[in-house]
Amino acid sequence: MYAIIKHSGKQYKVSVGDDLKLDHFEAESKASIEVSEVLAINDKELKVGAPFVAGAKVVLEVINHGKDKKVVIYKKRRRKDSKLKRGFRRQFTRVVVKDIKA
C-alpha cells in the first residue's frame, strides 16, 4: 500500500514505515501530523484524486529537525575583478509515516 502526498509544493511517494526528509515546518518533536492532501492512493486498486482523494489521510510523526550540508554559490565575472561567494544550509524536518487511511 502506498500513497502520493503533496507537502510544501512537492510530491512524495510514501508507504508505512518510510523515513522522509521534508522542508522545514513548525512542529514539536514526536508530534503527529495528518496530511489530507493525498493525490493518489493504492490499496489493491489505484484511486486518483481530482485533485485530492476524498477521505484519505496520511499520518506522519516528526522525528527531529536539522540542517543539510552547506550549498556554496560562487559567481565570477571574468576579467572584471568581480566575484561573489555565498552559502547556506537548508533546514529540514525528518518524519516517519505511521499510517495511511484510505
From Swiss-Prot:
GO terms for biological process: translation. PROSITE patterns: RIBOSOMAL_L21 (PS01169). The keyword Acyltransferase does not apply. Disulfide bonds: none annotated. SUPFAM superfamilies: L21p-like. Keywords: Ribonucleoprotein, Ribosomal protein, RNA-binding, rRNA-binding. GO terms for cellular component: cytoplasm; ribonucleoprotein complex; ribosome. InterPro entries: bL21-like, bL21-like_sf, Ribosomal_bL21, Ribosomal_bL21_CS. The keyword Electron transport does not apply. One of its GO terms (molecular function) is rRNA binding. This protein binds to 23S rRNA in the presence of protein L20. Belongs to the bacterial ribosomal protein bL21 family. Part of the 50S ribosomal subunit. Contacts protein L20. This is Large ribosomal subunit protein bL21. The lineage of its organism: Bacteria, Pseudomonadati, Campylobacterota, Epsilonproteobacteria, Campylobacterales. The gene is rplU.
